[in-house]
Structures are given as C-alpha cells and as structure tokens.
C-alpha cells in the first residue's frame, strides 16, 4: 500500500545514496570475474522505521551481488516511518542497487 507520507531514509534520498556508496562492499570474486548488475530489493519499512522482510525482487544475475545488496539493506539505519491518517503504517518499498565496476 502507498501511504500519504512515504517512509524516508534519515536525511532523505541523497543520504540514502551516500549510505549505499559507503557501505556496499563489492565482493572480490565478483570484481575478479567482472560481474556487474542491478539487484532490485524489496523490503518493508515498519511502523517504528525498522527494515523487515527484505528480499530480491529482481536478481542482478549473480548470487554474490544479490547477497551483498540484501546485507546492505538489512543493515540500514531506521527510516522515518510512513504515515496514513496521522498514524505510522508499514510500507513496502523497492530499491534498485547497482553494481558497476569503475
């Protein structure tokens, strides 16, 4: 369900991108094999802002990259919860995580 006020990562989308950039650890085996891809992760932002029910919605094509995407999602700090009619609500969220070698 979509909430009147969607959940937000602390500091907004810019901080989320910064968090991902600083916390994704590109697996060595993936680097050695030049594996790239985009893993689309789905998760629920709970009423208290915690992250739950994380799963891969669309695979990057590489299990190692998918596992790293999930790890970084599950380790995110609490979000500001979504709101509906003045109450905190659970909101499902999808986020693409890109793995690209420089």
Question: What residue spans do the PLM features occupy?
Answer:
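G2-box/ATP-lid motif of Bergerat-fold
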Residues: 38
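Intrinsic disorder and flexible coil segments
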Residues: 1, 45-48, 95
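Cyclic nucleotide-binding regulatory module and flanking cytosolic helices
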Residues: 1-14
């Amino acid at each position: 369900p979509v909430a009147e006020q969607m959940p937000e990562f602390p500091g907004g989308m810019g901080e989320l991108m910064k968090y991902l950039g600083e916390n994704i650890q590109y697996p060595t085996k993936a680097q050695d094999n030049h594996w790239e891809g985009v893993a689309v992760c789905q998760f629920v932002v709970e009423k208290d802002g915690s992250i739950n029910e994380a799963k891969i919605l669309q695979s990057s094509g590489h299990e190692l990259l998918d596992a790293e995407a999930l790890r970084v999602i599950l380790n995110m700090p609490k979000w500001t919860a979504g709101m509906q009619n003045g109450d905190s609500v659970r909101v499902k969220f999808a986020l693409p995580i890109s793995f690209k070698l420089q």
